Amino acid sequence: MVYKVVVSDEDVTYQLELEDKDAKTVNGLKIGEEFNGGVLGLKGYKLRITGGSDKNGFPMKEDVDGTRRFKSLVNGGTGFKPTKKGLRRRKTVRGNTIADDISQINVKVSERGEQTLAEIFAEPEEEQEE
């Protein structure tokens, strides 16, 4: 299992992949919980899980416990944006726990490390020959 992790820091987002052996450390965590950013190579950072989606694109919802899919009647928020006042829809959402069939995890920075994210993700500049 490989997770795509979207790290959000103020106005900028960065995308990483979490490989098999490191993915086991975030398995079982819920939305709102924090984990060490060293798993992703972000030394000194603490990351808070804000959401995600499963392999079929269904979004994770914070108030649905477990790893199951659930058809929820929603009037806004996760998975649905109403176009008229009072409009409600039954939408399929995912539970709030990370499991094997989650494909994307959204996180935000809760504690910063020594280096900024811009420095960590900066591409090395190639020397130009003159």
From Swiss-Prot:
Pfam families the record matches: Ribosomal_S6e
Molecular-function annotations in GO: structural constituent of ribosome
Keywords for this protein: Ribonucleoprotein, Ribosomal protein
GO cellular component, one term: ribonucleoprotein complex
Presence of keyword Ribonucleoprotein: yes
Gene Ontology biological-process entries: translation
Superkingdom: Archaea
Similarity comment: family membership: Belongs to the eukaryotic ribosomal protein eS6 family.
PANTHER family, per database record: 40S RIBOSOMAL PROTEIN S6
Name of this protein: Small ribosomal subunit protein eS6
